[in-house]
A protein has these predicted regions:
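Bacterial N-terminal signal peptides that target proteins for export
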Residues: 1-10
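Bacterial N-terminal signal peptides
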Residues: 9-20
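Short, surface-exposed interaction patches in beta-rich subdomains
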Residues: 161-163, 168-261
Length: 261
């Protein structure tokens, strides 16, 4: 066979392969009623949640898989609370046969979001209201802003929130990482057990209650009114400034540093 014939055959094979892959792809879309949203999706590569104008009381969900038949175990429910879950709990091993699955969700501005993730899913969240997340595994969650935070991390998951304006609670068991860019919150409760890290880049906090057990590290580059700080083990707590009451306790080789006005 000539070189030209080989090239033509390769081109035909490539085009037919693309067509075959496209034919195998699957897409599902749902519009649900709901005042809040709960998301619990196993074995998904990416979930993006964004606010959209004109969606009062509605949630629009679209899921795409590179392989046909992979979305049949998705469960969509509407009502007072909208939810999307996946019945599957064991993920296929990594490799060429593993399907790529992504989910896009549009919600009303300010909607409360509750996320549960037990794997390595990447969550991208826009400006929402209340944001609760329970992350077990090695996933990522980034959010533009939230008005109220409750984050629970067990494992090595990472959470990054651009801005917060309400109370926050963060609990880390393991080597997880949590960061807020800028904050103006009335209260912040932190509990780190293990080697987890919590960082606040800038802002103001009314009441800070922070405890580290293990080798974790807290770096709070915000102005705090009242703070209660404690370490057990080799952990480290640093607070840029405390203007009011400061209470601290330490057991082990850890350090507590707090600037005073």
């Amino acid at each position: 066979m000539s070189r030209h014939s080989l090239s033509a055959a390769a081109a035909i094979f490539f085009v037919s392969s693309l067509a075959s892959l496209a034919a195998r792809a699957e897409t599902v879309s749902q519009t649900l009623d709901g005042k809040t949203l709960s998301v619990d999706l196993a074995c998904v590569d990416k979930v993006e949640i964004q606010p959209s104008a004109g969606l009062a009381g509605k949630v629009v969900i679209g899921a795409t898989s590179s392989k046909d038949g992979e979305l049949k175990d998705f469960v969509f429910k509407g009502g007072e609370a909208a939810s999307v879950t996946r019945e599957r709990r064991s993920c296929p091993s990594t490799g060429l046969d593993r399907p790529k699955i992504s989910v896009s969700i549009q919600v009303p501005a300010g909607m409360a979001i509750d996320i549960t993730n037990g794997g390595s899913t990447n969550y991208v969240v826009g400006a929402v209201g209340v944001l609760h997340a329970r992350l077990a595994g090695s996933g990522y969650l980034t959010a533009v802003s939230a008005t109220d935070l409750d984050i629970r991390i067990s494992g090595s998951s990472s959470v990054n929130v651009g801005q917060t304006t309400g109370p926050a609670t963060v609990k880390i068991a393991g080597s997880g990482d949590f960061r807020i860019g800028n904050t103006d919150m009335p209260s912040f409760k932190i509990d780190v057990r293990g080697s987890g890290k919590v960082t606040i880049d800038n802002g103001r906090i009314g009441t800070l209650t922070a405890a580290v057990a293990g080798s974790g590290a807290l770096k709070i580059m915000a102005t705090v009114q009242d703070a209660t700080l404690s370490t057990v083990g080799s952990g480290d707590i640093e607070v840029a400034k405390v203007t009011g009451t400061l209470s601290s306790s330490k057991a082990g080789s850890g350090t507590i540093r707090a600037g005073r006005s």
